[in-house]
Amino acid sequence: MPNPKNSKGGRKNKRANSSGDEQENGAGALAAAGAAGAAAGGALAAAAGCGAAAAGAPGAGGAAGAGGAGTGAANAAAAAGAAAAGDAKNEAPCATPLICSFGRPVDLEKDDYQKVVCNNEHCPCSTWMHLQCFYEWESSILVQFNCIGRARSWNEKQCRQNMWTKKGYDLAFRFCSCRCGQGHLKKDTDWYQVKRMQDEKKKKSGSEKNTGRPPGEAAEEAKKCRPPNKPQKGPSHDLPRRHSMDRQNSQEKAVGAAAYGARSPGGSPGQSPPTGYSILSPAHFSGPRSSRYLGEFLKNAIHLEPHKKAMAGGHVFRNAHFDYSPAGLAVHRGGHFDTPVQFLRRLDLSELLTHIPRHKLNTFHVRMEDDAQVGQGEDLRKFILAALSASHRNVVNCALCHRALPVFEQFPLVDGTLFLSPSRHDEIEYDVPCHLQGRLMHLYAVCVDCLEGVHKIICIKCKSRWDGSWHQLGTMYTYDILAASPCCQARLNCKHCGKPVIDVRIGMQYFSEYSNVQQCPHCGNLDYHFVKPFSSFKVLEAY
């Protein structure tokens, strides 16, 4: 007959030191206690009969119940943590050193992102970029290649091919600072191949499961069904990425091959397009231009009903912005339209003369159609109209006063001037992207009233007045004209740390240099530091 004291002594002999070994895993301790109680209850039942068994059963049941409750709580907490971790894995912050074009995390379930790596082992930043953010960052690095001696002999295609190789990255790493401030980013060239192999493996296993055949038979059947001269297609998961990359390359080859020589009053050097330059533009750009009155133009050019039907049917495309304002002049990018974008034909310059003095009506102050036939004006006109047609727009808004400016099909193209900015400005709802020498730029405009001083434009920092009267009307500048003439030190400060990038008393040599990527000497961030938001100017009053 076993001695009950021995079983109690066995309990006392159990290790329970002051370091809390039993308390490290609460659920495990409760489960162990329940098991010990059940064993002790069984021993007492065998020794003392039914009474002892009846007395031991409640103790064993209570201990076992406590252990089960603790284990259930632990399992529930673990499941909740796993679910939260799963949701967090589907998104990651964008790792671009520049400003994120989307302002939201990267959705890892989609196929529009790129992986990058930082050479800092303890980098806390993300390793994922939106595909568009990666292209913008890559284009900003390409701009800096023009300043490097060994890379000056490379063309754009060679720069893109060599950038992430060893010889190219040895030159480019200085422009690839990571947000952590202690490392440099680099494109993960192995990631896409690994992902592609995984997608192919998943597709192959999925097709074998669907057919219900052994893997060998399925592979042989696929080979038999495949045409002999037709190349093998890639996996369907790679199609969106391939389409986006092909579209990016085609746009850069067709549209971004040249920077046009729009005359800058400060002597900024113009650049001419290369020989054999071709532009992607609608056929009616080069054909005969028929006369069209304003009423007929508005009736044919406004496509409000297709927009409303598309919105009601849920056909909302990515990066699409719709404007149903009373003006109703804008034809936005909202899908595939059969009707080409139509631009207004300027009958005379009487409307422009109401905003400028008569002595300024000459080819120096206003870009004329006759002047365009002499130089590169025809290519410039096609470039602008092609970019607007691709975005389905025939009206632009002033960046300062937001006045609607119809675009004409002849010079002067607008009652104001157009310019390209490397940054996407949120103050303007629509976006007209275009590629210029491999750089992604955005087309904006300033109206003639803001340029000529009819509207008083002041800087919100120093309260000084902005003067745009020296700009040529009706043409396009290949840089941000609002950033080209900084009035105070605040316009030359870093966008991240707020410290001065350069001294305002020194400035830059050319107007276009203010629209280039600069590196802050204090925090090391690469950005378009001098391209400030349009809201940094204020329309104080209109005379």
UniProtKB/Swiss-Prot annotation:
<dbReference type="GO" id="GO:0016020">
    <property type="term" value="C:membrane"/>
</dbReference>
<dbReference type="InterPro" id="IPR054537">
    <property type="entry name" value="HECA_N"/>
</dbReference>
<protein>
    <recommendedName>
        <fullName>Headcase protein homolog</fullName>
    </recommendedName>
</protein>
<dbReference type="GO" id="GO:0030323">
    <property type="term" value="P:respiratory tube development"/>
</dbReference>
<feature type="modified residue" description="Phosphoserine">
    <location>
        <position position="268"/>
    </location>
</feature>
<feature type="compositionally biased region" description="Basic and acidic residues">
    <location>
        <begin position="197"/>
        <end position="211"/>
    </location>
</feature>
<dbReference type="Pfam" id="PF16002">
    <property type="entry name" value="Headcase"/>
</dbReference>
<feature type="region of interest" description="Disordered">
    <location>
        <begin position="1"/>
        <end position="26"/>
    </location>
</feature>
<keyword id="KW-0217">Developmental protein</keyword>
<dbReference type="InterPro" id="IPR031947">
    <property type="entry name" value="Headcase_mid"/>
</dbReference>
<keyword id="KW-0597">Phosphoprotein</keyword>
<dbReference type="GO" id="GO:0005737">
    <property type="term" value="C:cytoplasm"/>
</dbReference>
<comment type="function">
    <text>May play an important role in some human cancers. May be part of the regulatory mechanism in the development of epithelial tube networks such as the circulatory system and lungs.</text>
</comment>
<feature type="region of interest" description="Disordered">
    <location>
        <begin position="197"/>
        <end position="283"/>
    </location>
</feature>
<dbReference type="GO" id="GO:0005634">
    <property type="term" value="C:nucleus"/>
</dbReference>
<feature type="modified residue" description="Phosphoserine">
    <location>
        <position position="264"/>
    </location>
</feature>
<dbReference type="GO" id="GO:0045930">
    <property type="term" value="P:negative regulation of mitotic cell cycle"/>
</dbReference>
<dbReference type="Pfam" id="PF15353">
    <property type="entry name" value="HECA_N"/>
</dbReference>
<dbReference type="InterPro" id="IPR026066">
    <property type="entry name" value="Headcase"/>
</dbReference>
<feature type="compositionally biased region" description="Basic and acidic residues">
    <location>
        <begin position="235"/>
        <end position="250"/>
    </location>
</feature>
